[in-house]
């Protein structure tokens, strides 16, 4: 079983934290290839999605960044 994350939403969440994909790899403990798959809209395991979301929720959003991002 697998699921897909929204590419745009994941990229936005990374930007809000000032993170790169490599930062997400380190914070989530997931392989770079799995993070790449998620960022390109390919299916990933639900357990990987859980780890991605958990890592993002633990990281603070940088104040003022949202206003700088295009919607």
What residues fall within each predicted segment?
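Recognition helix of helix-turn-helix/homeodomain-like DNA-binding domains
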Residues: 29-44
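Compositionally biased non-globular segments, especially hydrophobic aliphatic-rich helices
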Residues: 23-24, 41, 58
């Amino acid at each position: 079983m697998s699921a897909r994350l929204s590419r745009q939403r994941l990229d936005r969440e990374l930007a809000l934290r000032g993170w790169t994909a490599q930062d997400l790899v380190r914070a989530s403990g997931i392989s770079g290839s799995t993070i790449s798959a998620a960022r390109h809209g390919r299916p990933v395991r639900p357990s990987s999605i859980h780890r991605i979301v958990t890592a993002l929720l633990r990281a603070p959003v940088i104040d003022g960044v949202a206003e700088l991002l295009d919607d």
